[in-house]
C-alpha cells in the first residue's frame, strides 16, 4: 500500500561477477553465482550498503537509471549497492511527508531485502547505511531504532513486509552506520546550539538589546540541566556534568572539560596527520594565541571552548536554530503534518517561552508562547503527538536510560560518526554525545 510509487521503490546494483546471465529477447535471465569472488566476497557474503542522501531531511527519489561511474567504487569493492526511495520533510500533492515517514520508508526497504534474501545477492545480516547532514541523522536513526515498536503502525500503514513466509518477524535493524554531520537529537538541538555557540555571539538575534538574546541565555542554561540529567559517561565510566561558572553559562565541569579535550585532540590529529616536522606544527599554531603546542608530545591545548568558538565555530543560525520562531527552518517541516506543512516542536523552548517574562523587551511578541504550546499538541494522521514522532527521530531516545526507549530496539553494533569541527550548522555536542 505505497503512499507514493515515486519514492517507495528501490534499485539494487550488483557486481556482474555475482551473476550468470543469458540474453532472452529484450531482457536477461540471471541466476546467482555463489562461487565467484569480488574483493574477497561472494554473492552471499557481500555487504549491502544503502546511501541515505537526504540532506535537510529531504526526500530521496527512487532511481530510474544508473551510471556505472558513480557506483564503480562500491561494486569493485564487492558491495551490493541499494538505492531506496523515501519521502522527505515536505508534503506532496497526494502524500504526507515529514517524520517519521522518511525513516519508515527506509525501514520498509530493508525489510523488503530480507524478505527476498534467498533470491537476492548480499548478506542480509550485513546492511550498512550512510549519509550526511539530515541523511546522517536518518542513518543514525536507522542504526539506533532497529525493530522499534514505535514504527509498527507506520509500517503497516504503507503495507511494509512484517513477517516472512514462515510467519517469523522480519527485522529492519542494520549492522552499521556511517554518519557525517548528523543534524539530529532535535529535542535538544536548540538548547545545545545556544550553549555551545550562541552564548558567545553578540550580534543579530543575540545582540544585547533583543529579547532573543535573553532567550538564548535561557536556552543555554536549559542545556546544562539536560546534560546533568542525561548522565553521559566518558570512556572510563565517569559521569559527565556541567557546573555554574564565574563567566559564561555553565562552562565548567567534567562535560565541559571533555568537550575541550575533543577539540584539542582534533587539532592534535590534524597536525600529526598533515605535518612531519615539529617546527612546521609550531608555525601552524603560532597564529592562534589561544593554542599552546607541546613539541615533545606533539599535542596541543586550548585556552577555552569560548576562544575556539569565537575563532572557528561561529553561530550561523538565529536563536531557535532548528525550531525557528517563524517556523522557517527545515526541521519545522520535518514535524509538520497533513494539516500544516510546518509546526513548532521544541517543548523545552515552549516551556521557557511560557514561563519566562520577556515583556520588558520592545521587540517581544507574546504570541510566540501560545503558538509553540498549540503546535506541540497537534497530531499526525495516526493520532500521535509531536513528542512521539520526535522520539522516533531521536537516536538518543534508544541509546540512553534518560529516555523511555532505552533497550527497546536493536541497535547497530558498528558506528562511525564524523563532523566538520568548524561547521556552524549544529553544535559539536550533537556528534560528541
Regions found by a protein language model. Name each.
Residues 115-200:
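Primarily recognizes the serine-hydrolase "nucleophile elbow" in alpha/beta-hydrolase
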Residues 10-15, 23-57, 72, 128, ...:
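Short beta-strand element of the alpha/beta-hydrolase
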Residues 177-184, 188-335:
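Non-catalytic, alpha-helical, charged scaffold/linker segments
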Residues 96-119:
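Alpha/beta-hydrolase active-site loop
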Residues 42, 63-81, 156-160, 164:
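Short amphipathic alpha-helix adjacent to the substrate-entry channel of hydrolases
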Residues 44, 49, 54-61, 81, ...:
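Serine-hydrolase catalytic-loop signature spanning alpha/beta hydrolases and amidase-signature enzymes
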Residues 48, 75-87, 128:
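A fold-wide structural signal in alpha/beta-hydrolase
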Residues 275-433:
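C-terminal subdomain of alpha/beta-hydrolase-fold enzymes, centered on the catalytic histidine
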Amino acid at each position: 500500500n505505497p503512499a507514493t510509487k515515486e519514492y517507495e521503490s528501490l534499485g539494487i546494483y550488483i557486481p556482474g561477477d555475482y551473476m550468470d546471465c543469458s540474453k532472452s529477447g529484450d531482457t536477461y535471465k540471471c541466476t546467482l553465482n555463489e562461487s565467484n569472488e569480488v574483493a574477497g566476497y561472494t554473492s552471499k557474503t557481500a555487504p549491502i550498503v544503502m546511501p541515505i542522501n537526504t540532506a535537510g531531511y529531504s526526500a530521496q527519489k527512487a532511481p530510474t537509471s544508473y551510471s556505472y561511474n558513480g557506483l564503480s567504487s562500491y561494486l569493485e569493492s564487492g558491495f551490493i549497492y541499494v538505492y531506496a526511495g523515501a519521502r522527505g520533510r515536505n508534503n506532496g500533492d497526494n502524500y504526507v511527508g515529514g517524520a517519521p515517514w522518511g525513516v519508515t520508508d527506509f525501514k520498509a526497504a530493508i525489510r523488503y531485502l530480507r524478505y527476498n534474501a534467498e533470491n537476492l545477492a548480499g548478506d542480509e545480516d550485513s546492511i550498512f547505511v550512510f549519509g550526511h547532514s539530515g541523511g546522517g541523522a536518518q542513518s543514525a536513526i536507522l542504526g539506533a531504532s532497529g525493530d522499534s515498536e514505535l514504527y509498527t503502525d507506520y509500517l503497516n500503514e504503507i503495507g511494509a513486509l512484517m513477517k516472512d513466509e514462515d510467519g517469523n518477524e522480519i527485522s529492519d535493524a542494520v549492522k552499521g552506520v556511517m554518519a557525517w554531520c548528523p543534524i539530529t537529537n532535535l529535542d535538544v538541538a536548540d538548547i545545545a546550539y545556544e550553549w555551545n555557540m550562541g552564548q558567545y555571539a553578540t550580534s543579530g538575534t543575540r545582540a544585547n538589546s533583543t529579547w532573543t538574546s535573553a532567550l538564548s541565555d535561557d536556552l543555554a542554561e536549559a542545556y546544562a540541566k539536560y546534560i546533568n540529567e542525561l548522565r553521559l559517561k566518558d570512556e572510563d565510566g565517569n559521569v559527565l556534568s556541567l557546573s555554574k561558572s564565574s563567566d559564561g553559562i555553565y562552562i565548567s565541569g567534567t562535560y565541559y572539560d571533555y568537550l575541550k579535550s575533543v577539540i584539542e585532540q582534533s587539532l592534535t590529529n590534524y597536525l600529526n596527520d598533515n605535518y612531519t616536522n615539529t617546527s612546521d606544527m609550531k608555525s601552524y599554531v603560532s597564529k592562534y594565541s589561544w593554542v599552546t603546542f607541546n613539541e615533545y608530545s606533539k599535542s596541543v591545548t586550548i585556552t577555552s571552548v569560548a576562544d575556539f568558538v569565537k575563532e572557528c565555530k561561529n553561530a550561523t543560525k538565529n536563536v531557535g536554530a532548528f525550531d525557528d520562531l517563524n517556523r522557517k527552518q527545515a526541521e519545522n517541516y520535518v514535524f509538520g503534518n497533513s494539516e500544516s506543512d510546518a509546526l513548532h516542536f521544541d517543548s523545552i523552548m515552549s516551556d521557557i517561552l511560557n514561563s519566562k517574562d520577556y515583556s520588558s523587551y520592545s521587540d517581544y511578541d507574546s504570541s510566540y508562547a501560545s503558538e509553540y504550546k498549540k503546535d506541540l499538541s497537534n497530531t499526525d494522521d495516526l493520532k500521535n503527538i509531536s513528542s512521539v514522532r520526535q522520539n522516533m527521530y531521536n537516536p538518543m531516545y534508544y541509546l540512553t536510560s534518560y529516555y523511555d526507549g532505552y533497550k527497546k530496539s536493536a541497535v547497530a553494533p558498528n558506528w562511525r560518526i564524523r563532523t566538520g569541527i568548524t561547521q556552524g550548522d549544529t553544535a559539536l555536542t550533537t556528534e560528541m554525545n
